[in-house]
Amino acid sequence: MSWTTPKKAIMLAAAAEGGTKLNAFDNALLKMGIGNVNLVKLSSVIPAHIEWLDELPKNIPIGMLLPTVYAHIESDEPGSTISAALGVGLSENNEGGLIYEYAGYCTKEEAEEMVRKMVEEGFKVRGWKLKEIKVISAEITVKDKPAAAVAAVVMFPY
């Protein structure tokens, strides 16, 4: 198997309910448009000169392997609010960046604040100059069905 350094990426987030916690997770992936591919979990480094997309590419093959950084949480506890967030830190001149993820029993604002702090620290310890932070999140309060919140950065080789 050969891997290619990703050239494009997109930030996505969604929350959904389902008959089980796993079905809720799957339904959130479907809402984001990535429910029929295989997500390959990555750690959190963004390649240099990546192009950020505003919408998913058309006709992604079913079963395609897509490098992805994602945060997720599922719950079946009625009344619980759950959130997932990703923070993307971009360096000066698009020379690379970092992605940090967080998911928990909290509001999306709390999750977003957590990933912002993580991005800032990640850049500081590397001695990199932070140009911009992008954040995406999803939140849901569990009602009578299991629920999931998912946030992802999906990368594409083309």
From Swiss-Prot:
One of its GO terms (molecular function) is arginine decarboxylase activity. Pfam families: PvlArgDC (PF01862). It catalyses: L-arginine + H(+) = agmatine + CO2. Gene3D superfamilies: 3.30.60.30, Pyruvoyl-Dependent Histidine Decarboxylase, subunit B (3.50.20.10). Binds 1 pyruvoyl group covalently per subunit. Its EC number is 4.1.1.19. The modification Pyruvic acid (Ser) is found at S44. Its cofactor is pyruvate. The record marks S43, S44 as: Cleavage (non-hydrolytic). Keywords: Decarboxylase, Lyase, Pyruvate. GO terms for biological process: arginine catabolic process. It is an enzyme of class 4 (lyase). The keyword ATP-binding does not apply. PANTHER family: PYRUVOYL-DEPENDENT ARGININE DECARBOXYLASE. Belongs to the PdaD family. This is Pyruvoyl-dependent arginine decarboxylase. The gene is pdaD.
